Amino acid sequence: MQNASLASVFSTAALALATVLAAPSAHAVEYVGARFAAPATGNAVVSYGSGDAQSFDIDFGTMTRVTLAFVTFRDEAAPSMSFSALINNFTGYNFEGLNVRLTGGAVFQSPSGSVIPTFGTLAGTVVTPTQVAMSFSSGEPYALSFGNPLGEVGASDWMIDFSSVESGATFGLSVTAVPEPGTYAMLLAGLGLIGTIVRRRQR
């Protein structure tokens, strides 16, 4: 599923690439599109940044995954960009965790950026070169700042190094919303009911 989503996003990126490359760029990277995994009802992405300073509003109306695609330009000695996102929760359920993952050769730089819940309590953050996994001891019902999208004093953006990504190639950044256990239970129950209906119809 994720590879299919990435392929779709990157095919869109490829279409945008010719347009982006046609004009001179003073930046090493450009955002070219986003795709939500199904179900995508009520989900949206709005870009507020550009070039080497990327910032987004990401709205989750359903618990799913969004993948952002970026095209690189190797016109800098040390290609990197700052990244921040206000991740809004419109699902009606708490976020119990959020996972941010890089694909395509990009990696997170040290030091780590900020993770700021609005009402939830952050239990821990595990950072690897390609993933940031966040968990909550009390779920987040409203929004979380990944990096510093709101310009808060003392907060900092996440830095992403894409020096290993070839010029003109794309890399992806995905954000996955992890629902509370009760949501999983309801989802599994719903899938079980659907399976029962299908089996009865087949008979």
Regions found by a protein language model. Name each.
Residues V29-A177:
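Mature extracellular "passenger" or substrate-interacting domains of secreted, surface-exposed proteins
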Residues N3-E30, S167-I197:
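Short, threonine-centered small-residue motifs that mark membrane-proximal processing/anchoring sites
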Residues R200-R203:
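Short, charged juxtamembrane terminal tails flanking transmembrane helices
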